[in-house]
């Protein structure tokens, strides 16, 4: 097949050569137009349309309109970020997964690795970029990136370095996904959830810290091990600050509705002959043990975050101990984020459960709030 197309000089009118540029523009791909920069001359070299495997295989039936779908973005592709990614993928929780990281080689490598495994998952669309535009229109954004504590560094200095990082991340997230929910995983999670709330100006229900969701899972697992019962049948809560100063609510621990405190009134105290308080000590020590042995924690927190993601995207209205603002509760007057039982759904945190605490448990919660507020008060936002 051969086509003849006139060469049009810049000095000539379109009508004088009988060429319709609008039609040409529609018919030709810009890459099939070669510019000759001589005397204002442009030369178009058309190429005949050739059949492709795709065109021979697929018959166009109708035009497709954009369909609303769910999208999750993860900021940070370190060990925690990738554990979150694979956990969400295996649960098939979203139609699209976007990954963001400044380490472009690692980002591309991790993404390709996941993409090649996508035939075994229910999420075929996995994208990545170091630019936040790839997160546009996310339903949920999970932040796992942040600075790590250096040897001898104060907690305040670590938080302040993370504030600088969060300022860049949050502004970009808000720009591209102004209606998303945020899950903060980076540590110290309670303070950084507060920072994300302040920087984003999002309503409080859309800012969620992973908080004590994992602490509570560890608590139930260890209780189950001690009793020889599956952890799903062990009901108990770890509240307050994620980490060393978390509060075990022994007054609420029960198995099949039987409160353990009814069987052992001193459970969880120094007077307890069975020393159940060691269960909570093990909860707080476990992370350090894992880090000592393998260098970091990843899988448990990844599965925990996927659990939160499922409750939000599927609007399950399940109860999770996540970090949220608790000003006005339990005698706390400061704007601090601590973990209490929250109902999670498509709007984020929809309701709080007013769990009854003993005076001792409430005192521990207030102490955590005071410690956090002393640090938050010194932050430069």
Swiss-Prot record:
Matching InterPro entries: L-lactate/malate_DH (IPR001557), L-lactate_DH (IPR011304), L-lactate_DH_AS (IPR018177), Lactate/malate_DH_C (IPR022383), Lactate/malate_DH_N (IPR001236), Lactate_DH/Glyco_Ohase_4_C (IPR015955), NAD(P)-bd_dom_sf (IPR036291)
MF GO annotations: L-lactate dehydrogenase activity
Key words, A-Z: NAD, Oxidoreductase
Pathway stated in the Swiss-Prot or TrEMBL entry: Fermentation; pyruvate fermentation to lactate; (S)-lactate from pyruvate: step 1/1
Residues that bind substrate: 155, 187, 218, 297
Any GO BP annotation: pyruvate metabolic process
Coiled-coil residue spans: none
Catalyzed reactions: (S)-lactate + NAD(+) = pyruvate + NADH + H(+)
Pfam families, sorted: Ldh_1_C, Ldh_1_N
Keyword match NAD: yes
Active site: 242
EC numbers, comma separated: 1.1.1.27
Homology family: Belongs to the LDH/MDH superfamily. LDH family.
Protein name (database record): L-lactate dehydrogenase A-like 6B
């Amino acid at each position: 097949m051969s086509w003849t197309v006139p060469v049009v000089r810049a000095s000539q009118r379109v009508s004088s050569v009988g060429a319709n540029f609008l039609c040409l523009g529609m018919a030709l791909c810009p890459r099939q137009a070669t510019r000759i920069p001589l005397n204002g001359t442009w030369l178009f070299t058309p190429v005949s349309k050739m059949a492709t495997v795709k065109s021979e295989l697929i018959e166009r039936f109708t035009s497709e309109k954009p369909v609303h779908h769910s999208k999750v973005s993860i900021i940070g592709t370190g060990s925690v970020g990738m554990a979150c990614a694979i956990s969400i993928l295996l649960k098939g929780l979203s139609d699209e997964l976007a990954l963001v990281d400044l380490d472009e080689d690692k980002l591309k490598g991790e993404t390709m690795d996941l993409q090649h495994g996508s035939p075994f998952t229910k999420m075929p669309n996995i994208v990545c970029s170091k630019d936040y535009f790839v997160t546009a229109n996310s339903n949920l954004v999970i932040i796992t990136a942040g600075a790590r504590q250096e040897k001898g560094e104060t907690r305040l200095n670590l938080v302040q370095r993370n504030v600088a990082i969060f300022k860049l991340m949050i502004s970009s997230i808000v720009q591209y996904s102004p209606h998303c929910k945020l899950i903060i995983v980076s540590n110290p999670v309670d303070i950084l959830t507060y920072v994300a709330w302040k920087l984003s100006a999002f309503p409080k229900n859309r800012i969620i810290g992973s908080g004590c969701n994992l602490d509570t899972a560890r608590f139930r697992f260890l209780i189950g091990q001690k009793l020889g019962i599956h952890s799903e049948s062990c009901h108990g809560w770890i509240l307050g600050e994620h980490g060393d100063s978390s509060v075990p609510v022994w007054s609420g621990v029960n198995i099949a509705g039987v409160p353990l405190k009814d069987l052992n009134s001193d459970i969880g105290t120094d007077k307890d002959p069975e020393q159940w308080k060691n269960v909570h000590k093990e909860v707080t020590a476990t992370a350090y043990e894992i880090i000592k042995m393998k260098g970091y924690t990843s899988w448990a927190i990844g599965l925990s975050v996927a659990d939160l993601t499922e409750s939000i995207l599927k609007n399950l209205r399940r109860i999770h101990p996540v970090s949220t603002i608790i000003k006005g509760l339990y005698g706390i007057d400061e704007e601090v984020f601590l973990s209490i039982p929250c109902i999670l759904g498509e709007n984020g945190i929809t309701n709080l459960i007013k769990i009854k605490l003993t005076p001792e448990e409430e005192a521990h919660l207030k102490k955590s709030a005071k410690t956090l507020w002393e640090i938050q008060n010194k932050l430069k936002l």
